[in-house]
Amino acid sequence: MEKIKMPVPIAELDGDEMTHVLWGMIKDTLIKPFVDLNTEYYDLSLPHREETADAVTAQAAEAIKRLKIGVKCATITPNLQRQEEYGLSQLWKSPNATIRAALDGTVFRAPILLKRVKPVVTCWEKPVTIARHAYGDLYKAVEYRVPGAGKAELVFTDESGRELSRQTVFDFKGPGVVQAMHNRDASILSFARCCFTYALSVGQDVWFGAKDTISKDYDQTFKLLFQKVYAEEYKAAFEQAGLHYRYALIDDIAAKVLRSKGGIVWACKNYDGDVMSDLVAAASGSLPMMTSVLVSPDGCFEYEAAHGTVTDHFYRWRKGEKVSTNPLATMFAWAGALRKRGELDGNADLVRFSGCLEQAGLDIFEAGHFTEDLTMLCDPSEYTDKPDNDTLLGLIRARLETLLTE
């Protein structure tokens, strides 16, 4: 079989631990035998981020901007324990947060559904897609650990140096902590447009929730800008497509999502989306069964698996044990990036390969070959075996070869 040509590269962002191992296995077993893979490689492993003082992360973000498409492996965001383990000079920032801030995009996360795995929320018949604003809020916050009594103030000075606002946050009588968050109208507007455009492309309603009754400036701004974009730019198209936009308080939206049939785009502020995407993944099946794509306003796409580095499997694998790690989300990340490259370049063969890659993985799982994470969710009668990584990828490759020759 002649390899599929890929003249234009994508940015490849490698990562850490077990997902790094699986990353290489997927490339070598499922992609390189069939595609003349063309990537610009960036090593975002924690040791290399330490070596480059995290410059490699900024370089990777610029590559995604330039090439329009990137695919990213899961990476470690270090805490104090990881700093000691890896001998880090400092606690480097989350690569995801850095890249999201650089691209100023929206993260869309949707579960990969299997007929054999029933969702915890039994009324869900279709996927719930989380649209997470990927800028600002907690992830760009400024914090201060208050040592003792004193006053914390929120001050705004305009570009000419004139003080426009000074508000007391709190008069501390003892130690405490203070935090200041921000966002930009331009980023919120692009977030809204990304959500409505994506929803139109997949034919789903948009639900958005915030807490404007309490946050009468911050959350109210989100609410008003969403409504403005919808009314002025998308309402006619939504009505023509038979779709709807719904706003409610975040707690009300959360309750309504759990009672819905699914098939909605749930727009969330940054922190809300971080939490709710994992909740939706767990309720749908398993976190390794969650796709993720970051879409920027200027048409850049970054695909990744919406899970961590699977540290426990890595430690076991390093001891020589055979492990059973779910590869589907990582496979879907590669497939998504290759498909988008093919769509942008008019490369029909690459688009077809991407669909076959996804289908091959689904077919093997639907045949009852489950990974460790899924066996814990099902009755033993629901699956036939629990193959290790090498065996599972071999089964998927055989199925992929069949699909490509049909």
Language model features by range: what are they?
Residues E2-V8, M18, L22, D28-A53, ...:
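N-terminal alpha-helical transmembrane segments of multi-pass membrane transport
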Residues M6-M25, L154-A248:
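Glycine-rich phosphate/diphosphate-binding loop of Rossmann-like nucleotide-binding domains
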